[in-house]
Amino acid sequence: KEKRQEEIDIMGEQDKNTALFAECKWTNEKVDLSILVTLAKHSRLFSYKNIHLYLFSKSGFTKGCIDEANRMGNVTLVSYADIVAYNLM
């Protein structure tokens, strides 16, 4: 494989076949599809069979991002509102 440097905010390995990759955005804009596409692309630089992607956002997600996350099936979207609601439980 080609050697490259890419920024990944969070990476965790469960075992030799499974890992998670995450991107965190603390902005006033919703996270759009391009962020998800970039994270998915960066995760493919590794040879894990099972990849789980997480996007964390202060301001939520665009419809395009939500639709693609649902289509992909291995993506979890977490907004700041989700975190606050979870902490209130």
Where are these regions (language model features)?
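A cross-kingdom feature that marks ATP-driven nucleic-acid transaction machinery
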Residues: 1-89
